[in-house]
Amino acid sequence: WERTKNWNFGVDLELFHMFYMNLEYYTRRSNAVITVDLPFEYGINDMKRNGGIIYNRGIEYTLSFTPVQKRDFSLNINLNASKNWNKGGETTIDRTTGMYLTGSNTQILKEGYPLSGFWSYSFAGLDGSNGKPMFNYVEVPEEEKSKGIDPTTYLVYSGEKEPYFTGGLGLSFRYKSLSLNTSFSLLLGSKKRLTSPYNDFRGEHNMMPDPTKNINRDLLNRWQKTGDEAYTNIPGLPIWPLGIAWTLPNTETAESPIYMWEKSDAMVVSASFLRCRNIGLSWQMKKEWCDKIHAKNLSINFNMDNVFVIASKRFNGFDPELENSIMPRSFSLGLNIGF
């Protein structure tokens, strides 16, 4: 059973018919229900059980401000935002290196860390002789390797997958029969792992590019000769034995140096962004003009969606929300006539 304790505090405030605010603060404590894998001999793949304590707290608020409200001119500003914190308490689940690398939104990985936190291999640069990626903390003497070693002793914390702050801003401006509306969104605090330029090579012989397929343009900046390691962190085409597996300090096995590089902090990027989601402009024809064309009303409107986004340059033009594609910009022009 999952047990949850909540505490909420809220305030609604309105002043002079110009300013409105809604503010809510909450805390929540729950004993998490998690899914755990079971051995084959149990006859089922997994089961639900209590796996630890989760602490959540956050603040959400909405502000609306109308500094000017006249017959021919008005301005309205709307702001909504939320900031959330969570962390895991004690947990009883067994955690693997893969779980730390992937992260989780439902399981506690490490006490005191956010629920959506994830970890990475610590990238130490490229080998100048062959472009092979190197890593900190993973090479230890064989006699010191043990199944009981905590993976976070050789991994580094990379941040949260979920944002700790989200916000939206809306502006409405009217002058006589002309109206302008805009909306913005802001997301702060989340981290993402970039898609590997070697991702399309999966399944190819020796992980070398297939001449019949396109390849990621980031590979133009890969290591190609001695000295390139000073300017790039993208490994060279793997000429070292691909079958080589890296035995980690806790005796788990990493697939290959390329895989470890893909899961390293070299591939972690800030996913914070500011986006202008919409700009809308409309014009309403005066009633006396409408009468001349025997119409009750007439309006023309123009809208632009996904106007721009400001995000990390490491996305190389891709959208920080979609990762591997681009959110298209769209335009619309409309004419409304009522008779």
Predicted regions and their residues:
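Membrane-embedded beta-barrel scaffold of Gram-negative outer-membrane proteins
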Residues: 1-43, 82, 86
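Outer-membrane beta-barrel signature, preferentially recognizing the C-terminal barrel domain
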Residues: 1-20, 47-70, 112-114, 126, ...
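Outer-membrane beta-barrel channels and translocator barrels
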Residues: 4, 16, 28, 56, ...
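Transmembrane beta-strands of outer-membrane beta-barrel proteins
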Residues: 9, 21-23, 75-77, 169, ...
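Short loop/turn motifs that connect adjacent beta-strands in outer-membrane beta-barrel proteins
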Residues: 18, 68-75, 88-93, 110, ...
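Transmembrane beta-strands of outer-membrane beta-barrel pores
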Residues: 25-31, 65-67, 81-87, 175-177, ...
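C-terminal beta-signal and terminal closure region of outer-membrane beta-barrel proteins
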Residues: 51-56, 101-130, 205, 219, ...
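Extracytoplasmic gating/loop element in the C-terminal half of outer-membrane beta-barrel translocons
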Residues: 189-294, 298
